[in-house]
Amino acid sequence: MKFTPSIVIDAPQYYVDHFNGKYNVDKCVILRDLQLETDSESMPSSLKHLTKPTHILDLTNNDLIMIPDLSRRDDIHTLLLGRNNIVEVDGRLLPMNVQNLTLSNNSIRRFEDLQRLRRAPRTLKNLTLIGNQVCHLANYREHVLRLVPHLETLDFQNVTAEERKSAMSFPRQADGDTLGPVNTAIRDNGSRDKTMEIMNLVVSKMTVERRNELKKQLAEATSLEEIARLEKLLSGGV
């Protein structure tokens, strides 16, 4: 489904207080579960209608293949893009004051797909990439921290001083990529298809009642950790 102005304008909105503990401060706009697709024409023009301020933008479980261009937005501090088909992360497209970015369960497979993450705003503190094949590559955390040294948490784990030191000591290749052995099994082109096959099998066996229960819990989730846990269950737990 393509983005349209009406979809953006009519998107459900609610306020949350779990980011700073203050009641009715952070406005969350919900554009999840709509099968929205990346489109170079309709997506940018439609997102211009996104209400302002929007502090949390939820685009979870759509068909996006790239991050939408939100670089002109100074109000969005949390961007939820889990369970899409994003293959490359371009930090230049992120909101200028983004602090929290969730990209769990996408199609990010190689370190090369993360290179433009180095252009992310320095405000980015919390990044989630769980469920992407790139997470299984050797020296994954060090590589990400080399690209985004100002991160405080990666995949819900605090970044340690030792990790920062290790990341900075990594040698670089001529093209700017950090060196490190790669798990060749992960690079197999068929591995993604196999993962999706398993995921579909697990989800198909889940009862409607169970799925509805998980969706209700997801709507009431009060932390990024809880959201990620429930999203993983809904996607089959793989």
Swiss-Prot record:
Pfam family, one: LRR_9
Disulfide bond annotation, renumbered to this chain: none
Quaternary data: Belongs to the CWC complex (or CEF1-associated complex), a spliceosome sub-complex reminiscent of a late-stage spliceosome composed of the U2, U5 and U6 snRNAs and at least BUD13, BUD31, BRR2, CDC40, CEF1, CLF1, CUS1, CWC2, CWC15, CWC21, CWC22, CWC23, CWC24, CWC25, CWC27, ECM2, HSH155, IST3, ISY1, LEA1, MSL1, NTC20, PRP8, PRP9, PRP11, PRP19, PRP21, PRP22, PRP45, PRP46, SLU7, SMB1, SMD1, SMD2, SMD3, SMX2, SMX3, SNT309, SNU114, SPP2, SYF1, SYF2, RSE1 and YJU2. Interacts with MSL1.
Protein's UniProt name: U2 small nuclear ribonucleoprotein A'
Alphabetical list of PROSITE patterns matching this protein: LRR
GO biological process terms, semicolon-separated: mRNA splicing, via spliceosome; U2-type prespliceosome assembly
Taxon lineage: Eukaryota, Fungi, Dikarya, Ascomycota, Saccharomycotina
Organism: Saccharomyces cerevisiae (strain ATCC 204508 / S288c) (Baker's yeast)
GO molecular function, one term: U2 snRNA binding
Function description: Involved in pre-mRNA splicing. Associates to U2 snRNA in a MSL1 dependent manner and is required for normal accumulation of U2 snRNA. Required for the spliceosome assembly and the efficient addition of U2 snRNP onto the pre-mRNA.
Keywords: Leucine-rich repeat, mRNA processing, mRNA splicing, Nucleus, Repeat, Spliceosome
UniProt-annotated location(s): Nucleus
LRRCT domain sequence ranges: 132-170
Region described as Disordered: spans on this chain: 167-189
PANTHER family documented for this protein: U2 SMALL NUCLEAR RIBONUCLEOPROTEIN A
Location, primary (coarse class): nucleus
This protein's record includes keyword Ligase: no
LRR repeats: 53-74, 75-95, 97-118
Gene3D superfamilies registered for this protein in UniProt: Ribonuclease Inhibitor
Additional note from the record: Present with 3630 molecules/cell in log phase SD medium.
Gene from which the chain derives: LEA1
Similarity comment text for this entry: Belongs to the U2 small nuclear ribonucleoprotein A family.
A GO CC term assigned to this protein in UniProt: spliceosomal complex
